[in-house]
Each structure stands twice: as C-alpha cells, then as structure tokens.
C-alpha cells in the first residue's frame, strides 16, 4: 500500500480515493477536531519541506499529501519507525 500511495502522490491525487481516506481517518478517530488538527499540522510541515526543497512544483497539495500519509500510517502502523 505504501508503494501505491507514492504512486498517488507522484501522479496526482484521485479525488474519490482522497475522500475515502479522509472519511476513514475521521471515522476511526475518537476526536474529529484533533484529527483535523493533525492533518493541518502535517500539511504545514510538508509545505515547509517543499519550500526548503527549492520550490519544486508539485501537483499534489500539502493537505492531500498529509491525508494520504496519515491514512497509510493508520492502516499500516507496523511500518512506522521506532
């Protein structure tokens, strides 16, 4: 699934897949507000990461990347470092 998410990120985001991932994150959380804050914080980190990377143009917005990453982490927690 990780390889699939990198394909999604590199080729652009399928809106229906992104919606399903977002709904899954919200549905499986105990606090919708905190989940929204996590997505926003991750998106902000990615935006600054992109900025530090010499402003490479990306077709995927930071919020979209954040949803894909957090969804993958939720679905496959054994792949997280540590």
UniProtKB/Swiss-Prot annotation:
UniProt GO cellular component terms: DNA-directed RNA polymerase complex
InterPro entries given in the database record: DNA-dir_RNA_pol_omega (IPR003716), Pol_omega/Rpo6/RPB6 (IPR006110)
Reaction(s) catalysed by this chain's protein: RNA(n) + a ribonucleoside 5'-triphosphate = RNA(n+1) + diphosphate
Keywords: DNA-directed RNA polymerase, Nucleotidyltransferase, Transcription, Transferase
GO molecular function (one): DNA binding
Pfam families reported in the protein's UniProt record: RNA_pol_Rpb6
UniProt entry tagged with the keyword Transcription: yes
A biological process term (GO) from this entry: DNA-templated transcription
Domain of life where this protein originates: Bacteria
EC number(s) on file: 2.7.7.6
Function text: Promotes RNA polymerase assembly. Latches the N- and C-terminal regions of the beta' subunit thereby facilitating its interaction with the beta and alpha subunits.
Subunit structure comment from the entry: In cyanobacteria the RNAP catalytic core is composed of 2 alpha, 1 beta, 1 beta', 1 gamma and 1 omega subunit. When a sigma factor is associated with the core the holoenzyme is formed, which can initiate transcription.
Entry similarity comment: Belongs to the RNA polymerase subunit omega family.
Protein name in UniProt: DNA-directed RNA polymerase subunit omega
Species of the source: Synechococcus sp. (strain CC9902)
